[in-house]
Amino acid sequence: MSKLGGKNKKAFADFVNKLKALGADIQQAEVNVVNKATAAAKEVTLDNTPVKTGTLKGRWADIPLIILNGKISKGYTNNLYYAGYVNDGHRTVNKSGETVGYVEGFRMLERGITRGRLAMRPLMDEEIRQIKRKTGF
């Protein structure tokens, strides 16, 4: 996935502070939120991936969750050689190599990343509500 920026970074810091105040397992809560946000992002990416033969759509694979120096990272990837052309668009050429047109990209990955970022705040709020229910606050 992509890095948190701006409002999401501040929201995540507020989320951690609230978890500390509740005495919750912060790392587990962060892992839960990251897993759910990545799943939401991947779902939108899959929905926006065009289906011609199904090969491109079937090649989306999860990148395992990694915790390194207190930072949590998780994502998904598509290693099919033409995935970038479908996502970003590409030029079309004639037999002599001249550009004769351009095929717009589907931007499925960007749509998924946007969905993942937008899902962060509600997921953090839901995680705090669940912890409050468990701890009796």
Where are these regions (language model features)?
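Short, Lys/Arg-rich flexible segments
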Residues: 1-83, 90-137
